[in-house]
Amino acid sequence: MFLDYYLRIKIKRSHMDILEIMRKQDPLYPTFEQIYTASFPLFEQRTEEQQEQAFQSPNYHLVAYLKDNLFIGFISYWDFSTYVYIEHFAIHENFRGQGYGGLLLEDFNKRLNKIILLEIDLLRMKFPPSD
């Protein structure tokens, strides 16, 4: 049942499971979608049709990181011959600020051993901040 949907790998140091979500019917997809929509503005999100198209590409991967069966975060990326492009990366709001983001990226880097491109959008804030 699990293995039909997931690629299961252990991160030894943190005892996390890395599970690949390969389609919208995956049992983890609703949790991914909840974190995704809460973490990214609408203009940076894929439509349902675009997500289905991405799943059809052999270069596209969406991996969920779980610890003790709790969905910690995800990385969606495109894997090319000499580099990897991380399109979306988010940690569930309940686990932010606890070092999971760095741990996931460190593991990701070790497993893929390629150049990693990661786009980062700056927060738009007024300076100086007003009350």
Predicted regions and their residues:
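Short amphipathic alpha-helix that is part of the acyltransferase structural core
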Residues: I11-Q50
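Active-site rim helix/loop that mediates acceptor-substrate recognition in acyltransferases
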Residues: S39-K67
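Conserved beta-strand in the GNAT
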Residues: A64, N69-W78, T82-A90
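A short, internal acetyl-CoA/4′-phosphopantetheine-binding micro-motif in the GNAT/acyltransferase core
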Residues: F89-R96, L122-R124
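Conserved acetyl-CoA pyrophosphate-binding loop and the N-cap/start of the following alpha-helix
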Residues: F95-D107
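Conserved GNAT acetyl-CoA-binding A-motif
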Residues: L112-S130
